[in-house]
């Protein structure tokens, strides 16, 4: 049996969830990820991994009406026996609905973000403007329509309790391969040398540093932690406006996007990992996948109390109020000043990850969902 996973833009970081689902399913079924590519190449962290991608270059046809000609090709490439749409977006879930209409197959929908929430960050007037943007295939009007059609899927999976309350479905959080990502397998000294670090105390942020991720708060917080504290931002574009602004601070070091499989080789260098989400419509339903990177690798974590993070890190992480730079700096200073306590916190985080947020835990839920869907054909 073959599973086709549909992603709405293979050049975007949303590819990360599709890549994870493919890795989870691959031991049991043939899997490939299908979708349009609005950028020049497949998203860098996923590009050279084990997952098979069948991307369709959009080029000049990125808006309606020209994009309408792409739908048939995208639906034809989703030729699996089971369809799994990643996100309720038109160019993933919408294409999956069309593919199912052409040839009846089970369709599962995976929701890992509140997509309409992303359009609300600019307030009422910004939302109004976006609601009139009919030319964007994944714009607000069409994404809103997809969320109204969630019930048409044969099964729904969600990545957070907020999303479960809004859309129903089975909870399948982001997870990590805790066997492959065993910190004992990676050389911490080598990782620090790669970053040009010696005895400095290192705080690390890993991910796509968008505004709602709270990186500005983190840069400010680390700046007051102490003269030997360094902040390493992995995944930040040094050439971007924000990247240049952050790099102007002497305590900040930037590393561009890295392959997903290289994450442990960088993250083990950290003395603490920060997940400083802000409280916005972007983050209310979001659980940052990178918190599980840190947990799997036994890193001490400081996070803001947003979405499911208090539940996930209960007893194995430090929580601070979102947007509170003073509280964030205080928590980081405490972790960096207590190596033994930090190590114990990291140990508990890894154990929690193995129990609840590992590949084994996710497959125990995901495999039966796919099997039930396949049996309904």
Residue spans for each PLM region:
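N-terminal subdomain of nucleotide-sugar transferases
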Residues: 1-48, 155, 220-223
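Conserved donor-binding/catalytic core segment of Leloir-type glycosyltransferases
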Residues: 4-6, 197-213, 219-223, 232
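Carbohydrate-associated surface elements
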Residues: 162, 175
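Acidic anion/phosphate-binding donor-loop and adjacent secondary structure
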Residues: 176-194, 242-244
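A short, well-ordered alpha-helix in the C-terminal region of glycosyltransferases
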Residues: 193, 334, 341-356
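Nucleotide-sugar-dependent
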Residues: 213, 259-266, 271-296, 303-311
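Nucleotide-activated donor-binding/catalytic signature segment of Leloir-type glycosyltransferases, i.e.
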Residues: 241-267
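Conserved acidic donor-binding segment of nucleotide-sugar-dependent glycosyltransferases
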Residues: 315-326, 334-340
């Amino acid at each position: 049996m073959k599973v086709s996973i549909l992603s709405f833009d293979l050049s975007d970081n949303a590819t990360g969830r599709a890549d994870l689902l493919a890795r989870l399913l691959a031991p049991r079924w043939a899997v490939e990820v299908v979708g349009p590519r609005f950028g020049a190449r497949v998203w860098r962290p996923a590009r050279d991994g084990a997952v098979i991608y069948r991307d369709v270059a959009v080029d000049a046809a990125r808006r309606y009406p020209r994009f309408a000609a792409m739908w048939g090709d995208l639906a034809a490439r989703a030729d699996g026996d089971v369809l799994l749409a990643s996100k309720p977006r038109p160019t993933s879930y919408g294409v999956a609905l069309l593919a199912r209409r052409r040839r009846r197959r089970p369709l599962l929908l995976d929701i890992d973000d509140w997509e309409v929430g992303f359009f609300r960050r600019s307030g009422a007037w910004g939302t109004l403007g976006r609601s009139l943007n009919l030319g964007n295939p994944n714009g607000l009007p069409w994404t809103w329509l997809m969320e109204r059609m969630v019930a048409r899927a044969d099964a729904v999976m969600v990545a957070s309790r907020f999303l479960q309350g809004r859309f129903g479905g089975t909870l399948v959080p982001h997870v990590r391969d805790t066997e492959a990502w065993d910190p004992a397998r990676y050389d911490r000294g080598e990782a620090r040398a790669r970053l040009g670090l010696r005895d400095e105390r290192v705080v690390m942020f890993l991910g796509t540093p968008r505004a709602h991720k709270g990186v500005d708060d983190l840069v400010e917080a680390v700046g007051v932690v102490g003269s030997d504290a360094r902040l390493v931002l992995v995944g930040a574009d040094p050439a971007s406006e924000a990247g240049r602004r952050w790099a102007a601070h002497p305590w900040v070091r930037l590393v561009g996007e890295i392959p997903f499989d290289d994450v442990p080789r960088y993250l083990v260098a950290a003395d603490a990992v920060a997940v400083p989400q802000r409280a916005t419509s972007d983050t209310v339903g979001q659980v940052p996948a990178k918190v599980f990177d840190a947990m799997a690798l036994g890193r001490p974590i400081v996070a803001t109390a947003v979405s499911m993070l208090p539940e996930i890190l209960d007893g194995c992480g430090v929580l601070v109020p979102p947007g509170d730079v003073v509280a964030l700096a205080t928590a980081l200073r405490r972790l960096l000043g207590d190596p033994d306590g930090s190590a114990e916190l990291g140990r508990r985080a890894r154990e929690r990850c193995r129990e609840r947020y590992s590949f084994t835990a996710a497959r125990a839920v995901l495999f039966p969902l796919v099997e039930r869907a396949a049996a309904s054909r």
